[in-house]
C-alpha cells in the first residue's frame, strides 16, 4: 500500500479504515530499508499524521500496529524531522517505559509495545543527531539502566533485553556525556559486569558455566561488551584503587571465559573480538587474571602456568591476520593485549616467543616471506597504517626482551628500522623494560650462516657482481662524480634529505647530526674550557 493512500486513510478518522491501512502497509514494508525518493513527501505527510496521534495517546489495542508503522518510517533518514521533536521522543520513551518524567501518554507494561518503541528509538538515535541530543537531555539512560538492573530478578523477553542494550550502546557510542554519566553516576561497569555474568551463565556457587553460548545469550553478551567498551575507553586512566581493581579483575575473569568458549552459529570470532577489545581497556595490572587458571589435564601448561587463554588469543590473532581490510580494528587490540601480557609476565613472554619466534633455521628466506606467524607479523611492520606497524613491531620487540640485536636477528634491520628510529635505538641501546636474562638459543644452521647474513634483509644473500669490474681508475672516478652530482641535485631540490645518526640514536638531518656530535665532543673535552 502506498504511503499516500495510508495518509488519506488516517485523515478519514475512521478507526477500522486506519488500522486496516496501517496493517497492510506494515506487512508490505516490514523488510523495506531503502525508499523511493518520489514518495518522500507522502512519507513525511504520513509521519506527521502518525506523530500527532502518538503524542496525544493511543488506545492500547492500536499501539503495536501504530508503532510498527513509525518504526518503518523511521528507517528513512529523509523522513526523521516529525519524529525528532521533544514531544514525540517523550511519547516513545513513555511507551518504552524508560521515561524519567511523567508524560501525557500513559506507561505501558505490554512488552510488545515496549519492544516496538525501543526499535523506533534505536532507529532515531542511530540516524538523527537531534534525537541523540534529546535522548541525552531526557536522561533515558537512567531508566534503561534501572531495567537492566532488574534482569536478575524479573524475566524480560530476549528482544526487549537486546534492544535495551542496543539503545544503551548507541547512546554511549554517540554521546560523550552519556558515556560519562553511565560510567560515573550510574556505576555502569559494575551493573554491566553483573549483567554479563548473568548472561554467560556464571553462578556465584562456582558451577562451571556452559562452554557453548546459545545464540540469544551471544547477541546480548556482545551488546554488553560493546557498551562496556564505550564507557571504559577514555575513563580508565592511571592507577585504580583496590575496590575498582577487584571489579576490573572480576570483569577480566569473565572476559577470560569469553575468549575460551564458542557460540552457537558462526559468531564465535565476532564474540571473541568484542571480548578482546574490552580486555585492551582494562588497567594493565588487572590482566594478570589471564594467567591465573589452575593447570589441569587438558590444559596447555608452560613453566607451571596455564597458557590456555594465551593460546586462545594467539589462535584468534592468526584468524584475524587472514583479513585483508580494516587490519587496525582486527589485529591491533589482540596484539596490544598479548604485548602487555608478555611485558609483565616472563612465562607468557617465553611461551609466546616459542610460538611466534622459534629458533631460526631457515636463514635464506627474508623474514617477511612465508606463512608462519612470524612472517605475517614482520610483514605488518611495514604496513601503510602506522598504528598497525607500531603494534606489530612492539609485540615482536617485547618478545625479544627489547634487545636490539635480537630484534634485528628475527626481523631484519630494514623492517626493524621504524621502531628503532622512533625509540632512538638505531645505534643500539638498552631496553626500557625490566627483563630477566633470557637465553636465545641459536640453531646450528644459524651459527653456520651468521657471518653471511645480510643484517638489513635478515637473510643469507649471494654476493652480487662488482659493477666496477673492468673499469679503469679514471672511469671509476667519473662514475663516482656523476653519483655525487646526482645526490647533490636531489638534495638541493629537497627531493631527498641526507640523514645521519645523532649521538642519542635518533635519525636527524646530516648537518644537525654533525653539529650535535661536535658539540658533545667539545663539551667533553677538558681543553675546550675557557681560560
From Swiss-Prot:
Pfam families: Ric8 (PF10165). It comes from Homo sapiens. It is found in: Cytoplasm, Cell cortex; Cytoplasm. PANTHER family: SYNEMBRYN, SYNEMBRYN-A. Transmembrane segments: none annotated. InterPro entries: ARM-like, ARM-type_fold, Chaperone_Ric-8_A/B, Gua_nucleotide_exch_fac_Ric8. GO terms for biological process: adenylate cyclase-inhibiting G protein-coupled receptor signaling pathway; basement membrane organization; cell migration involved in gastrulation; cell-cell adhesion involved in gastrulation; G protein-coupled receptor signaling pathway; in utero embryonic development; vasculature development; visual learning. The keyword Ligase does not apply. This is Chaperone Ric-8A.
